[in-house]
Amino acid sequence: VQWTAEEKQLITGLWGKVNVAECGGEALARLLIVYPWTQRFFASFGNLSSPTAVLGNPKVQAHGKKVLTSFGEAVKNLDSIKNTFSQLSELHCDKLHVDPENFRLLGDILVVVLAAHFGKDFTPDCQAAWQKLVRVVAHALARKYH
């Protein structure tokens, strides 16, 4: 994947302002609420019976932070995202058996969360750069499946 200097700047510039715990928790919670079939991968998280339960679940918040912290590795390593996520791809494919489509869904939700948090600072150019990034990350995570 080739990144323009502008794309890199838009991604890293916004990333520097992201509250990883808040945005990560919100993104994972939204995934579980909007696409409830994804909850089956999180049975050990306890009560996910309603949007209120999901949003208030500390395990959802903690794992969301973990997911977005990991996503930060992509931001730091834009030129080697496949290598950055090779072990996570293996884990999600071989051990957890996660449908790779879920990576795309979570990426799209992350873009929604960033747009909600950053409003007018999340310009169309910024959105395009982030949409490209979440696609590249989703593809890297799904790599072990191919």
From Swiss-Prot:
Give residues annotated as binding heme b.
H63, H92
Q: List the disulfide bonds.
A: none
The GO terms this record gives for MF are: haptoglobin binding; heme binding; metal ion binding; organic acid binding; oxygen binding; oxygen carrier activity; peroxidase activity
The UniProt entry, under Gene3D superfamilies, shows: Globins
Report domain Globin positions.
2-146
**Could you name the Gene Ontology cellular component terms for this entry?**
blood microparticle; haptoglobin-hemoglobin complex; hemoglobin complex
Report the CDD domains cross-referenced here.
Answer: Hb-beta-like
Gene Ontology process terms (BP): hydrogen peroxide catabolic process
Q: Which domain of life is it from?
A: Eukaryota
Q: Which keywords fit this entry according to its UniProt record?
A: Heme, Iron, Metal-binding, Oxygen transport, Transport
Q: Which InterPro entries match?
A: Globin, Globin-like_sf, Globin/Proto, Hemoglobin_b, Hemoglobin_oxygen_transport
Q: Which Pfam families match?
A: Globin (PF00042)
Tissue localization of expression is: Red blood cells.
Q: How does it assemble?
A: Heterotetramer of two alpha chains and two beta chains.
Q: What does this protein do?
A: Involved in oxygen transport from the lung to the various peripheral tissues.
Q: Which PANTHER family match?
A: HEMOGLOBIN FAMILY MEMBER, HEMOGLOBIN SUBUNIT EPSILON
Q: Which family does it belong to?
A: Belongs to the globin family.
Protein name, entry field? Hemoglobin subunit beta
Species: Passer montanus
